[in-house]
A protein has these predicted regions:
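Membrane-proximal lumenal/periplasmic loop motifs of glycosylation machinery
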Residues: 30-38, 52-74, 81, 88
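Hydrophobic/aromatic-rich transmembrane helices and adjacent perimembrane loops
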Residues: 150-158, 199-200, 296-304, 325-373
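Short periplasmic/luminal acceptor-recognition loop of GT-C membrane glycosyltransferases, typified by
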Residues: 419-455
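Membrane-interface micro-motifs in multi-pass membrane enzymes
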Residues: 69, 116-167, 194, 348-360, ...
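Membrane-interface helix-loop-helix junctions at transmembrane boundaries of multi-pass membrane enzymes
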Residues: 172-177, 213-230, 294-334, 344-347
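Transmembrane-helix motifs of polytopic, lipid-linked glycan transferases
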Residues: 10, 17-22, 92-120, 161, ...
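Signature aromatic-anchored transmembrane alpha helix within multi-pass, membrane-resident enzymes
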Residues: 10-19, 175-185, 228-237, 304, ...
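Luminal/periplasmic acceptor-recognition loop/helix of membrane-associated glycosyltransferases
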Residues: 441-531
Length: 541
């Protein structure tokens, strides 16, 4: 009994911390429409079209971000058939994926970690090590894993599923055929979506399994792991090949194949080496050293997490923790694979290193497991909790501070539009937030000033701009129920209004003024929206 009470004391603070992070993520998901940026709204729109057309591949689209099979937008499509609200559906789907990640983390590492260690890792997994300045919209973690259109959540889930199976094979524990089939099917569907799983899971997993089998060919467990890794690689490759044969109905005027990762470009090896390394350091949090003194603690925390990840690997090797060290080696190899691909093959974005968000929670849990002595463990617990509290302040406080102001700002715009009978808005990439706050009562179609109209008076003044909307919304325009909205942001030279003012010719301005009449202007500290009415339905090239 005393031992159980002692164990509870060890992990109770982590339980409370995990619950705080969890409640915060859920609150953001269901109150975050005013943070919906272009990509988030695009994914919510994808879910809506999937539900309406009962297909993962909606027809006649201008541009959908990628194929979605088991990603959050695909899950949101199921919720849309119930709620008929794309933003609410995406909130439900993102929250479900968040909970599944936490549950899958627990299930995956339960065979090698005690409950206190698992809870310390779960606390970090819930967000304590995702360093950023906005829990709702940070593309360095929260938005792509947990909040509002969490696209990368599916990759992390499938990775955890495979690691859990690998650990059970290594520990000689039974693994059901249904679980194996689920993992292989998931690998196939992610292959259809993109090449990310091939890079972060399939290749490093196969290489480690192959090396371990070559070292000990007589071990049946190593042989099973190799067969599983090879099957995963094969299924993912089959998905990639299937991607090439699926007829794409999106009809994009801008991208012929939106499901592939961008190539590395034509820079030198040295340049690409620097860019790939910078992307990794950006994700880790060391990027904050370049900002003011307010952000220096977050940069220091990023350095500490980097040291923590390396220390955990050394300690596991020293303690001869076979499975713990193998999984950590896999995570490091996965990160190195992304880095190498960035140097040799693709153009790396920071979020491609998302395995970091698994490496640090796992490192935390393994350190907690292997530290000897109550004093060391107590100090480690306090340090981890303080780091989590500091990160919570940096991530949550900025959103909480401006929540009410932003909510009121966008509510006023939506009310004005509805009072004037507007059902469709055409605008640049900073305006979908307005449609998100309307709860699907107002439809958004993305447009941008047409540079070609500078010299061609017959060309339309606007062009579609990467929006996941059926192309009929650009053909069958109803001016009496439509408005053009252009944004002006002091932080963005490519905001629609600023681009119009600074980059287009006098003849274009004359045509624009003759076609559009400004009706309203809404201004906040971050952005100003100019609303125009028009009567000519042929405004789009």
């Amino acid at each position: 009994m005393q031992k159980d009470q002692l164990n509870r004391k060890k992990y109770l603070p982590f339980v409370i911390g995990t619950l705080i992070w969890g409640v915060t993520v859920l609150w953001i998901n269901f109150h975050g429409a005013q943070w919906f940026n272009f990509d988030m709204f695009a994914d919510a729109s994808v879910a809506k079209r999937m539900a309406e057309q009962h297909s993962f591949f909606p027809k006649d689209w201008v541009f959908g971000n990628q194929y979605y099979i088991i990603a959050t937008p695909a899950i949101a499509a199921l919720f849309y058939s119930i709620f008929h609200n794309s933003v609410l559906s995406m909130s439900c789907a993102s929250s479900l994926m968040f909970l599944l990640i936490l549950l899958c983390f627990w299930w995956s590492f339960r065979p090698i970690l005690s409950k206190p260690a698992l809870w310390s890792g779960l606390f970090c997994m819930a967000g304590a090590t995702i360093l950023g300045d906005s829990i709702s919209s940070s593309t360095y973690g929260f938005q792509i894993l947990y909040t509002m259109a969490s696209y990368y959540a599916c990759y992390l889930l499938v990775l955890l599923l495979h690691l859990g199976i690998w650990i059970r094979m290594g520990k000689r524990l039974p693994v059901s055929r249904g679980l194996l089939l689920l993992a292989l099917t998931a690998s196939f569907t992610l292959g259809i979506q993109s090449q990310r799983e091939m890079l972060t899971l399939c290749i490093p997993f196969f290489l480690i399994a192959l090396l371990l089998w070559m070292r000990n060919k007589s071990d049946s467990g190593e042989k099973k792991t190799l067969v599983f890794a090879l099957s995963t690689l094969g299924m993912n490759l089959a998905g990639l090949l299937c991607n090439g044969y699926i007829r794409q109905h999106q009809g994009s005027r801008y991208l012929s194949n939106v499901s592939s990762i961008e190539d590395a470009g034509h820079g030198s090896i040295g340049t690409r080496f620097f860019e790939s390394a910078k992307a990794f350091l950006d994700l880790v949090g060391i990027r904050y050293f370049q900002y003011g003194w307010k952000w220096k603690p977050l940069a220091l925390l990023g350095m500490l997490l980097l040291i923590l990840g390396l220390t955990a690997l050394v300690l596991c090797l020293k303690k001869k923790d076979r499975m713990g060290s193998r999984v950590l080696l896999f995570c490091w190899l996965s990160l190195f694979g992304v880095f190498a691909a960035g140097v040799l093959v693709i153009q790396v974005r920071a979020i491609y290193y998302f395995v970091w968000y698994l490496l640090i929670p796992l490192s935390t849990a393994l350190l907690f497991e292997h530290l000897s002595g109550n004093k060391k463990k107590s100090f480690f617990c306090v340090a981890v909790l303080l780091c989590g509290a500091m990160n919570y302040f940096y991530n949550v406080y900025p959103d909480a501070a401006k929540y009410q102001t932003q909510k009121q700002f966008y509510s006023e715009i939506v009310s004005w539009l509805e009072e004037n009978g507007i059902r469709t808005i055409y605008g640049d990439y900073q305006t979908p937030t307005i449609a998100a706050c309307s709860g699907d009562r107002i439809e958004f179609c993305s447009v941008f000033p047409n540079m070609a109209a500078n010299s061609d008076e017959q060309s339309g003044l606007l062009v579609p701009y990467g929006s996941p909307v059926a192309t009929e919304r650009y053909r069958d325009i109803e001016p009496e129920q439509s408005a053009l909205i252009l944004s002006d942001s002091p932080y963005d030279e490519m905001s629609g209004y600023r681009y119009l003012e600074n980059h287009l010719s006098e003849p274009y301005h004359s045509r624009f003024d003759a076609c559009f009449s400004q009706q309203a202007c809404f201004e906040s500290a971050q952005v100003t929206y100019y609303i125009y009415f028009f009567s000519d339905p042929d405004i789009i090239a």
